[in-house]
Amino acid sequence: MADKITSRQEDYSQWYIDLVRSAKLADYSDVRGCMVIRPNGYAIWEKMQAALDGMFKQTGHVNAYFPMFIPESFIAKEAEHIEGFAPECAVVTHGGGEELAEKLYVRPTSETIIWSSYKKWIQSYRDLPILINQWANVVRWEMRTRLFLRTTEFLWQEGHTAHATPEEAQEEVIRMINIYRTFAEEYMAMPVIVGKKSESEKFAGADATYCIEAMMQDGKALQAGTSHNLGQNFAKAFDCQFQTKDGVLDYVWATSWGVSTRLIGALIMAHSDDKGLVLPPKLASRQVVIIPILKGNKDEVRARARFIAKTLNRHGIPTFVDDSENNSPGWKFAEYELQGIPVRIELGPRDLEQGKCIVARRDTFEKTELLLDDELTINIEEILNNIQQNLYDRALQFRLDNTVEATTWEEFKASVEKGFVIAHWDGTHETEALIKEETKATIRVIPTDEEYRQQYNMDEPGTCIRSGKPAAQKVVFAKAY
């Protein structure tokens, strides 16, 4: 019930944990650092999977599956890559009661094991491009965990593509980060900033990393998706060469890209409130709950509720009826608000007599009377569309209200405690590290979206916010999850 949830104002971190557990999205496991994704949480992941998988396939990608165990010799082939992941790796040393001749790493990501296969599959330009996605679990040994946001094992998708030219690879990188943006904004109703990571924040082993960054309700940033241009690094590590159209040998150009169950954490923190989960309808496996008020002629009310549910379901609006008599209508209202059901329909004997029902929105708690006629389905559909748009608009306005353009170091330090800060940066790793050390803020994204760049005059030369040296552009700083 919602009364178990700490308010956001009182303790945002505890609010998040309370909500995840009370809404039955996930729970802690007896395995340290791991979580159990409960049916309510997994239903959201299934909706995310279905939407993303469709978008991947529309752009020519296919699914495959590769082993979760990676030989140590494979990992060692890409030095920068393993250096980035070494502290997070889980290693298998024994199997079948014996010590293994070669250690096996439980995949923290799959570049190395996949490129060992690509080397066998690619001989000529005719074998390219390869556009493969994998839905899998990965393991990264986390010391400080938080449900959905940071766990030792998590679910994700990882795309791995191979190309004949650097131009094709770069096109793929941009295509995929734009797919993530579309998914975040159109399905999650979560506005994101698209751009590049700084050199120190990019993926280990990549030439460049592109990302989408979202603002949570506490003003912190959350990296919601990444797309990496791997250049020829992995192809060289695995000696993956192909014969070009000109008949010469060249190394393959590569990309990788992925999102994870971390998106569920982002979804929660972008929209939810002190009463519980708030879900955009497109990611709600159950969009409408009908609660009959069982007084007087119960059978007639029940029958009408089930008829309405059947009609809505037939029109593609997932609807269910809670006509149990174990709990009061008030208890049910609070419970389904906690679970984030976007629309609630209340139907009692008096409503039936008057040919109407009460419809309540989860996002605004606004109640409307609707006639029980042929227009009911259309009206419910319109309300669901309005909720989807309102959640996006609300989140975008929140980001606008909590984004500051800082021109002094004092202003920067004060503002970064509350949200995003746009400021000049001199482009050096030293200044970036100093800012992180003093404020815990990092460069979240160097925006590439032209509209965003113009909105904040990102290309305007100026003075670095920390070093005072000349700076060619502004970047987005924030504290992050």
Curated annotation (Swiss-Prot):
<dbReference type="InterPro" id="IPR017449">
    <property type="entry name" value="Pro-tRNA_synth_II"/>
</dbReference>
<keyword id="KW-0648">Protein biosynthesis</keyword>
<dbReference type="InterPro" id="IPR016061">
    <property type="entry name" value="Pro-tRNA_ligase_II_C"/>
</dbReference>
<dbReference type="InterPro" id="IPR033721">
    <property type="entry name" value="ProRS_core_arch_euk"/>
</dbReference>
<dbReference type="GO" id="GO:0017101">
    <property type="term" value="C:aminoacyl-tRNA synthetase multienzyme complex"/>
</dbReference>
<keyword id="KW-0030">Aminoacyl-tRNA synthetase</keyword>
<comment type="similarity">
    <text>Belongs to the class-II aminoacyl-tRNA synthetase family. ProS type 3 subfamily.</text>
</comment>
<keyword id="KW-0067">ATP-binding</keyword>
<dbReference type="GO" id="GO:0005737">
    <property type="term" value="C:cytoplasm"/>
</dbReference>
<comment type="function">
    <text>Catalyzes the attachment of proline to tRNA(Pro) in a two-step reaction: proline is first activated by ATP to form Pro-AMP and then transferred to the acceptor end of tRNA(Pro).</text>
</comment>
<keyword id="KW-0963">Cytoplasm</keyword>
<dbReference type="GO" id="GO:0004827">
    <property type="term" value="F:proline-tRNA ligase activity"/>
</dbReference>
<comment type="subunit">
    <text>Homodimer.</text>
</comment>
<dbReference type="Pfam" id="PF09180">
    <property type="entry name" value="ProRS-C_1"/>
</dbReference>
<dbReference type="GO" id="GO:0005524">
    <property type="term" value="F:ATP binding"/>
</dbReference>
<dbReference type="InterPro" id="IPR004499">
    <property type="entry name" value="Pro-tRNA-ligase_IIa_arc-type"/>
</dbReference>
<dbReference type="InterPro" id="IPR002314">
    <property type="entry name" value="aa-tRNA-synt_IIb"/>
</dbReference>
<dbReference type="InterPro" id="IPR036621">
    <property type="entry name" value="Anticodon-bd_dom_sf"/>
</dbReference>
<protein>
    <recommendedName>
        <fullName>Proline--tRNA ligase</fullName>
        <ecNumber>6.1.1.15</ecNumber>
    </recommendedName>
</protein>
<keyword id="KW-0547">Nucleotide-binding</keyword>
<dbReference type="InterPro" id="IPR004154">
    <property type="entry name" value="Anticodon-bd"/>
</dbReference>
<dbReference type="Pfam" id="PF03129">
    <property type="entry name" value="HGTP_anticodon"/>
</dbReference>
<dbReference type="GO" id="GO:0006433">
    <property type="term" value="P:prolyl-tRNA aminoacylation"/>
</dbReference>
<keyword id="KW-0436">Ligase</keyword>
<dbReference type="InterPro" id="IPR006195">
    <property type="entry name" value="aa-tRNA-synth_II"/>
</dbReference>
<dbReference type="InterPro" id="IPR002316">
    <property type="entry name" value="Pro-tRNA-ligase_IIa"/>
</dbReference>
<dbReference type="Pfam" id="PF00587">
    <property type="entry name" value="tRNA-synt_2b"/>
</dbReference>
<dbReference type="InterPro" id="IPR045864">
    <property type="entry name" value="aa-tRNA-synth_II/BPL/LPL"/>
</dbReference>
